[in-house]
Amino acid sequence: MAGACRNPAVALAEEDKEAEAMTLHQNLIAGEWVGEDGVANVNPSNTNDVVGDYARASAEDAKAAIAAAKAAFPTWSRSGILERHAILKKTADEILARKDELGRLLSREEGKTLAEGIGETVRAGQIFEFFAGETLRLAGEVVPSVRPGIGVEITREPVGVVGIITPWNFPIAIPAWKVAPALCYGNTVVFKPAELVPGCSWAIVDILHRAGLPKGVLNLVMGKGSVVGQAMLDSPDVQAITFTGSTATGKRVAVASVEHNRKYQLEMGGKNPFVVLDDADLSVAVEAAVNSAFFSTGQRCTASSRIIVTEGIHDRFVAAMGERIKGLVVDDALKAGTHIGPVVDQSQLNQDTDYIAIGKKEGAKLAFGGELVSRDTPGFYLQPALFTEATNDMRISREEIFGPVAAVIRVRDYDEALAVANDTPFGLSSGIATTSLKHATHFKRNAE
């Protein structure tokens, strides 16, 4: 009979998870938690695991949040810097103190490995800590005028109501690096996190709320971009918008913002090149390529999905990459020893496998990986895929896939490698593996 008894600690942990999943996590509008209808947030490593139930805001909720932020702005924009410092510092301290818990939440809702989840959470805490310090370093300038009797004083003023729209792939770091500076400099915020991963964003807002933010300064509206995001774009009371996400949506944000003459900031897609020259240290080049292309399941806008390799090292590099890929463990994000977690959801998995099929049809060779993987729990598992014999005009070389799929493009020399690297409509990030200071410096200055 003793063998049938449950470990009390395990039983308590399971009960806590069940209670958390059943709790409705509401939107925060004008300092009040509101919302009745929720949507389940599901773990991509185990689709039987419901992370939590999160309210879905309507367009009317978004309008109420904007109105609350507008009403709170005059007082918050003139608040004392020590008040802002204390709130942001308290938030940073709690995030860092809860890094294991919040990192685990991140891994459960987005699918990054636990080490990546905790690392991103620490980064979020550090961001809040940095901007807590920045509140005490606000500066201006007094400069002489060419006109007698005239003084020139330059001050930095808050913009007003800032709309924040964040993506699903960095569910705690990107909200941190948008929310923290907005609050630091006296702006009020209407925040719409990605629909797929509301948990970490809700946790940050809850921490800030308890840290003492006045009502209406920070408003959380979880829901569909087509509903909540559109209401933010349509409102003349939103003075600035910061957006990270797809290029197509970013263009719509830009057009809507121009119509309202508002400030806007966009962080969008990439098709990033990683160049490997003949003189590269092979082990360093392979490790850099694997990390950049496949870690975080390749779900980073800075992932290097175009690997451009010169002829002299090409075959050795591909063989070494293949061996490294074979050693990658694809499994539950929370399991010890997992290198690559699941893709975030079924839709993204379908996109990844569609592009693998496109690559084959275009004539590229699927050299390693690319298979769906079954594990102990139902999840969206995909073995990292490496194509060879790709060309830069193929769709797999030109379109952002946003998954663990990379293509090797063979080139003659450095000059061709640079030309291929720059032959893209994107311009986000790039890298090079070489022992030549000349080529490294030239690439740094000329990669577009």
What is the predicted role of each segment?
Residues P44-S45, A59-A62, I81, K99, ...:
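Residues at or immediately preceding the N-termini of alpha-helices
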Residues D49-L138, G149:
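Glycine-rich loop-to-alpha-helix module at the N-terminal edge of alpha/beta enzyme cores
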Residues D234, A240, A248-T391, Y414, ...:
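ALDH superfamily catalytic-core signature
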